[in-house]
Amino acid sequence: MILPITIYSDEVLRRKAKPLKGIDTSHEELIGNMIESMRNASGIGLAAPQIGLSMRLLIVDLSPVQGYENAEPMVVINPHILAVKGYNAMEEGCLSIPDIHADVVRPSSIQLKYRNEHFEERVDEFSALMARVLQHEIDHLDGTLFVDKLQRRDRRKVQKSLEDIAAGKVHTTYPVAEINQGAKAS
């Protein structure tokens, strides 16, 4: 089932998401719906707050990106970045902030502790695009948006567009949730 994407200015995007204590069949169904919703919106990452849920769950699927066509969707639960290395700038966008793109500086590689879709604990290292997408989605779990990381002059360039989105002036090819609907129970 395709779920509506929560848009900039909705309060759930600004809250620190709650950790999951385990997963059951309802979470498995949610994960499937998140993957379907992300693909429908032509995204490569989606965090639970982006569908209105305050839980530390995210999905990454780089398969639409050239060079990553064989990548499988990755489920990340309760992530915690243990270490970072190197920094680089790269253009980012966000399904919750349609039509805005800007360069964001992030670590180029990370060591991540998380639980997978079977709730098994993992510690893995990620670099390049995967590291960037994971950090972007983890930011969502912490109530941070990529526009919060912009330098002042870059933020000024997108401010009017952000105000338009907050006012409901949003045009997407995917369904969006009503703004300020609040967080749903997890």
From Swiss-Prot:
Q: Where does Fe cation bind?
A: C94, H136, H140
Q: Which cofactor does it need?
A: Fe(2+)
GO annotation terms (biological process): co-translational protein modification; translation
Q: Which SUPFAM superfamilies match?
A: Peptide deformylase
Q: Which UniProt keywords apply?
A: Hydrolase, Iron, Metal-binding, Protein biosynthesis
What's a single GO MF annotation on this record? peptide deformylase activity
Q: Which residues form the signal peptide?
A: none
Q: Which reaction does it catalyse?
A: N-terminal N-formyl-L-methionyl-[peptide] + H2O = N-terminal L-methionyl-[peptide] + formate
Q: How is the cofactor bound?
A: Binds 1 Fe(2+) ion.
- Give the positions the UniProt entry annotates as the active site: E137
| EC number of this enzyme | 3.5.1.88
One Pfam family, short name please? Pep_deformylase
What domain of life? Bacteria
Q: Which family does it belong to?
A: Belongs to the polypeptide deformylase family.
Q: What role is this protein assigned?
A: Removes the formyl group from the N-terminal Met of newly synthesized proteins. Requires at least a dipeptide for an efficient rate of reaction. N-terminal L-methionine is a prerequisite for activity but the enzyme has broad specificity at other positions.
Which protein is depicted?
Peptide deformylase
The encoding gene: def
